[in-house]
């Protein structure tokens, strides 16, 4: 088991980043790959969790230990796998997530991709009173500002598809952002907030 990997971020895709450590490139599946776009070709420390399946060995990466703990809590719930957990974390509303669990707000929880009513109820049952978010260690929410190219919007939509959101949902989001400019990371954060609320 690994606690973290330290190395150079060499590649960012819609689903993962590549972290090169001692000449080996590790594929790390992360909640929002474009959050790392400012760190390409720079050293980074990424907290990791390894999932071993019959057909694959996968590494999931996190910006902080608290984000990793939240991920581990989410995948402990029956019906939530690593991809769904990453999609929930990508919404970047961890305080809202904890509040929804504590107040049994099933409607809020079912807005995440692949989370139906039964899974949301299971989340409340399994995690109520157990999930604590230390806000300072988790990525901060960032408002959309007009400042980048439409290529960034395309990358953001690709990443959202990779998280499991439907193309029909994303068409509405894309239309909303047309004519604006921002980073892929900020588009993703804003889109996730819109889809979850």
Curated annotation (Swiss-Prot):
Organism classification: Bacteria, Bacillati, Bacillota, Bacilli, Lactobacillales
The gene is ruvA
Which keywords label this protein? Cytoplasm, DNA damage, DNA recombination, DNA repair, DNA-binding
GO CC, alphabetical: cytoplasm; Holliday junction helicase complex; Holliday junction resolvase complex
* Domain characteristics, as noted in the entry: Has three domains with a flexible linker between the domains II and III and assumes an 'L' shape. Domain III is highly mobile and contacts RuvB.
Tell me its family.
Belongs to the RuvA family.
Report the function annotation for this chain: The RuvA-RuvB-RuvC complex processes Holliday junction (HJ) DNA during genetic recombination and DNA repair, while the RuvA-RuvB complex plays an important role in the rescue of blocked DNA replication forks via replication fork reversal (RFR). RuvA specifically binds to HJ cruciform DNA, conferring on it an open structure. The RuvB hexamer acts as an ATP-dependent pump, pulling dsDNA into and through the RuvAB complex. HJ branch migration allows RuvC to scan DNA until it finds its consensus sequence, where it cleaves and resolves the cruciform DNA.
Question: GO biological process: what's one of them?
Answer: DNA recombination
- Subunit relationships: Homotetramer. Forms an RuvA(8)-RuvB(12)-Holliday junction (HJ) complex. HJ DNA is sandwiched between 2 RuvA tetramers; dsDNA enters through RuvA and exits via RuvB. An RuvB hexamer assembles on each DNA strand where it exits the tetramer. Each RuvB hexamer is contacted by two RuvA subunits (via domain III) on 2 adjacent RuvB subunits; this complex drives branch migration. In the full resolvosome a probable DNA-RuvA(4)-RuvB(12)-RuvC(2) complex forms which resolves the HJ.
Where are the stretches annotated Domain II? 64-142
Predominant localisation class = cytoplasm
Q: Which GO terms describe its molecular function?
A: ATP binding; four-way junction DNA binding; four-way junction helicase activity
Q: Which parts of this chain are annotated as the region Flexible linker?
A: 143-147
What's the protein here called?
A: Holliday junction branch migration complex subunit RuvA
HAMAP family hit by this protein: DNA_HJ_migration_RuvA
* Stored Pfam families: HHH_5, RuvA_C, RuvA_N
| Cell compartments where the protein resides | Cytoplasm
Q: Give the span(s) annotated as Domain III.
A: 148-197
Region annotation (Domain I) maps to 1-63
């Amino acid at each position: 088991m690994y606690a973290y990997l330290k190395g150079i971020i060499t590649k960012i895709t819609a689903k993962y980043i590549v972290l090169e450590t001692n000449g080996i490139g590790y594929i790390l599946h992360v909640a929002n790959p474009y959050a790392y776009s400012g760190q390409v070709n720079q050293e980074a420390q990424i907290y990791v969790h390894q999932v071993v399946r019959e057909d694959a060995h996968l590494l999931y990466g996190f910006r902080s230990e608290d984000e990793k703990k939240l991920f581990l809590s989410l995948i402990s719930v029956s019906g939530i796998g690593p991809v769904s957990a990453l999609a929930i974390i990508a919404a970047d509303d961890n305080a809202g997530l904890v509040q929804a669990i504590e107040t049994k707000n099933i409607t809020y929880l079912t807005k995440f991709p692949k989370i139906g009513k039964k899974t949301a109820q299971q989340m409340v049952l399994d995690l109520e009173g157990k999930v604590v978010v230390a806000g300072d260690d988790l990525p901060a929410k960032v408002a959309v500002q007009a400042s980048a190219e439409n290529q960034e919007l395309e990358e953001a939509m690709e990443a959202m598809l990779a998280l499991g959101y439907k193309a029909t949902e994303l068409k509405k989001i894309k239309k909303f952002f047309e004519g604006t400019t921002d980073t892929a990371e900020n588009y993703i954060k804003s889109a996730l907030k819109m889809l979850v609320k």
